Amino acid sequence: KRLQVDSNLSGLTGTTADVFRLLPSVVTDIEGGITFRGSNNPGLLINGVPYGLLEEYSGDMLIQLPALFFDRVSMTSTPSIGLVPDGDAGILNLSSAVYTAADSPLVLTLGAGFQERYNAGAILNLHPGKFHIVGKYNYRREFRKRTFSKSTTNKGGTTVMNNNASARPDVHLADLSVGYDLTANDLITVYGLYNLMDYSRYGKIHNNKLVDGNLQPVMFRHRYNDQRQEAYAAEARWNHTFDNPKDRLDVVFNYNNFGYDEDNEYKNEKPETGKIIAE
């Protein structure tokens, strides 16, 4: 099953996770996690290649990646021999958008929402002589708020924990493809991709204790949980088309790297005095 993003208005302006929801047998949750044919461990590829940024923290990435950046998503439970068959249930593949000389040389996108949520993107499409140059960039800023309450009762009484947290992910995604026609049947291409997701996160946990029917403040916990994910890739391709256009030879060399760093700083505050008692 394949879904062409630019011909589907409900997926055109969304994220990659939004588009996956349009595929049968695929379920995504609010955190971007994917379940495919009952398994939460499908293989995730970009242009048929496994990327580090889609491995351990793939859910976080999929709810940030702009859908139109990839143009097409596809799924298969029986991947071909040309794909790395990781995953318990099959393969979900993201295909980069392909632009030709017939397409606009410059495309600009802009979106905005409530609570300072917005995104902006640009596509540069040039084909001078035998060269094919396509560069894409997208910036996305979001706001997330989480609130929950938990009560624990034991012999010493009831403890109530109220947790309020907010996060502002800043996401940059860029790639550049430069192709050259060696012959009418041979195209060589160099490709690079860079992704940066930088979270600014703060949480405030308010612990109270209910003793003899009276609610007593115990502690405020301030949690500073900033997060940074950075990935880059370099790729070289050779595509040869034989006399029969259906016969092709594709050679791809890809190197990609992924890094993740998360802070977990906290300070415990005594509500009555405002004094920091632990950090």
Locate predicted features.
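Short, acidic, small-residue-rich periplasmic hinge/interaction motif at the N-terminus
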Residues: 1-9, 29-31, 39-41, 77
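N-terminal periplasmic accessory domains that precede
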Residues: 16-19, 58-63, 73-75, 81-109, ...
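Extracytoplasmic beta-strand/coil segments of soluble accessory domains associated
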Residues: 17-53
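Short beta-strands and strand-coil junctions in structured, solvent-facing domains, enriched
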Residues: 52, 79-83, 142
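Short loop/turn motifs that connect adjacent beta-strands in outer-membrane beta-barrel proteins
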Residues: 99-104, 185, 241-248
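Membrane-embedded beta-strand positions of outer-membrane beta-barrel proteins
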Residues: 106-110, 135-137, 190-192, 249-253
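Extracellular/periplasm-exposed beta-strand and loop segments of Gram-negative cell-envelope proteins
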Residues: 111, 146-153, 159-173, 198-210, ...
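Transmembrane beta-barrel wall of Gram-negative outer-membrane proteins
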Residues: 116-142, 157-203, 226-240
